[in-house]
């Protein structure tokens, strides 16, 4: 799965899955339809931490077609992520909680907060020391627009590069303007009911890409909000191995600096919870037995540590099994790849 700012973590959160959003550069994005070279990453969604570790082991590594992968430490050597699945991984660790993110984003639904507090207590009982690890610049970040500027600017450049590499392009679309024109004129795209507001903002309101001098200031602001004032600063300042948040709150800050996150099932809404829908009234957002997850956020290229911590939590809780799915696939991938 491809994530820019939530597309691994968010669906994993509400589908009772483990999801690993890797460090930007740990896995290749070559020929993945891009949004942002600074935030895009490819990672696994799976039923267990160990399954996700196996998948990450298979897809991580240097690719000459994606120069971001040249940043992988130790000359591109990949750790043994499966071996990192250690029941005792929480023992002796310092684990942070970004309480100010919860306070600022709040109020959080009571079932999620109750499960989160129980998870923090369980992690402490497993031998970890729990400390406050706030994101000091988070109050400024939530009022800031630089992330949108960076994503728009990257998208204008990166999409054109991707389209130029296609060997088959029957409609001769070469940039975002062409893609928007095609979308507006192709009936099956259901425009304007399904709008192109994000593209319109990039093209009509912003109008500059990541080669523009204005890009650098916006990008540096992002690095501050995600770095010293965000997850990286919290990790170093409090000397912790990971920072915890409910997964619904975790994607944004690590995305700014390309740092890794793993989400693990943490619980479910109760059976009598009222159904709430998205703004189009077409998808359930919360409701009876809808799952939610716990995120472990860490340092760049330190996925092995996060996998160990997540595995130790998962094996003590096994929340995935608390509710049985309505539909269970009767075909396994292994049936075809053996």
Regions found by a protein language model. Give the residues of each.
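Alpha-helix C-terminal capping segments
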Residues: 255-258
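Acyltransferase
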Residues: 108-136, 158-169, 220-237
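Structural helix-boundary/capping segments
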Residues: 2-99, 117, 121-122, 161-168, ...
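Acidic helix-start/capping segments at beta-turn-to-alpha-helix junctions
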Residues: 135-149, 332-334
């Amino acid at each position: 799965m491809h994530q820019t700012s939530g597309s691994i973590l968010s669906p994993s959160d509400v589908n009772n899955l483990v999801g690993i959003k890797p460090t930007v550069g740990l896995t290749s994005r070559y020929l993945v339809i891009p949004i942002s070279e600074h935030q895009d990453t490819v990672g696994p969604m799976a039923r267990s931490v160990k399954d996700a570790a196996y998948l990450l082991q298979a897809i991580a590594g240097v690719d000459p077609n994606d120069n971001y992968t040249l940043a992988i430490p130790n000359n591109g050597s990949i750790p043994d992520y499966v071996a990192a699945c250690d029941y005792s991984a929480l023992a002796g660790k310092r684990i942070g909680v970004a309480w100010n993110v919860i306070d600022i984003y709040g109020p959080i639904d009571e079932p999620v907060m109750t499960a989160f507090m129980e998870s923090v207590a369980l992690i402490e009982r497993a031998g970890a020391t729990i400390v406050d690890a706030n994101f000091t610049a988070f109050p400024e970040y939530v009022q800031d627009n630089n992330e949108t500027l960076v994503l728009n600017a990257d998208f204008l450049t990166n999409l054109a590069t991707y389209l130029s590499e296609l060997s088959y392009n029957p409609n001769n679309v070469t940039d975002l303007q062409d893609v928007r024109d095609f979308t507006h004129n192709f009936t099956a795209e259901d425009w304007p009911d399904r709008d192109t507001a994000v593209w319109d903002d990039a093209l009509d309101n912003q109008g500059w890409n990541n080669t523009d001098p204005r890009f650098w200031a916006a990008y540096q602001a992002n690095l501050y909000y995600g770095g010293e004032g965000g997850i990286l600063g919290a990790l170093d300042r409090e000397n912790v191995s990971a920072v915890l948040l409910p997964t619904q709150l975790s994607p944004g800050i690590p995305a700014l600096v390309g740092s890794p996150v793993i989400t693990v099932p943490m619980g479910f809404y109760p059976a009598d919870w009222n159904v709430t829908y998205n703004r189009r009234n077409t998808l359930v957002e919360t409701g009876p037995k809808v799952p939610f997850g716990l995120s472990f956020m860490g340092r760049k290229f330190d996925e092995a540590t996060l996998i160990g911590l997540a595995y130790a939590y998962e094996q003590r809780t096994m929340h995935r099994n608390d509710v049985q799915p309505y539909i269970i696939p009767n075909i396994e991938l292994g049936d075809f790849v053996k």
